[in-house]
Amino acid sequence: MILNCNPFSGLFLSMYLVTVLGNLLIILAVSSNSHLHNLMYFFLSNLSFVDICFISTTIPKMLVNIHSQTKDISYIECLSQVYFLTTFGGMDNFLLTLMACDRYVAICHPLNYTVIMNLQLCALLILMFWLIMFCVSLIHVLLMNELNFSRGTEIPHFFCELAQVLKVANSDTHINNVFMYVVTSLLGLIPMTGILMSYSQIASSLLKMSSSVSKYKAFSTCGSHLCVVSLFYGSATIVYFCSSVLHSTHKKMIASLMYTVISPMLNPFIYSLRNKDVKGALGKLFIRVASCPLWSKDFRPKFILKPERQSL
């Protein structure tokens, strides 16, 4: 792997910590506030969990390599990165689609919302998506395991991205490439089409609304989601469908960095800055932590110096 970025080790560590802390705060805020126990925030907390796992697949290994000043990654570690990146990337994709469908039903069919979007159905869908991605990732890894690689092969990337790994294989990768593009098309284009259709219906419904308050609330919620969708799908499309246009290795790495690191890091800020409910829940969470008895004076450690007994 290409790792000549020692000056940026602190930057990547900071980005990783900000991502984990930000998404963890979203999960804690949603779980600790009963007012946020609805489907929209259920999806958001799931997305935060997936984003933590997504960035944890690549950055820790990269930081270890930078610290040890090596570029090595074992074959098993590379297969593991391919497996988990495919799984968590696919789950990001599915969750963004479900969130778009949730907004579509809430805005366009509010009277039937509780019937169409119920917690049991959505939890079952998420579980089904996890199983689908586990199977797809396993097939990718099994097909990749049949390929031959030379010892000391350099992957022109900062992690084992499937498309880049296939390019350095010494055996025929036709089946791998066909499966990769078919799966990427089905699991990428179909959800993207669903998101576009949902927002086209949402836009037409918003134009018919007379209440400016309702419009603002819908725009703020949908605007945050659209920012995340644009960032994730835009960078992923460049990597998987426009790789022939990006002849520079560094441009491909920057595009990959956008959806594997930047997008998970920005998601908590995008969803919280324009959302009064999330900001309120975070404020209550901070107040609860600050007023915890653990930090009060009575719970500070005390040491009592006892006089030693003098022997007669």
Curated annotation (Swiss-Prot):
Entry GO MF terms = G protein-coupled receptor activity; olfactory receptor activity
Instruction: Tell me which Pfam families the record gives.
Output: 7tm_1
Q: List the disulfide bonds.
A: C78-C160
Residue ranges, Extracellular side? 1-6, 61-81, 140-177, 242-253
Any single Gene Ontology cellular-component annotation = plasma membrane
Please give the chief subcellular localization of this protein.
Answer: membrane
Q: Which GO terms describe its biological process?
A: signal transduction
Cited CDD domains: 7tmA_OR7-like (cd15234)
Q: State what this protein does.
A: Possible olfactory or taste receptor.
The name this protein carries in UniProt is Olfactory receptor 867
- Per the UniProt record, the source organism is Rattus norvegicus (Rat)
Which classification does the entry list for the species?
A: Eukaryota, Metazoa, Chordata, Craniata, Vertebrata
Gene name on record? Olr867
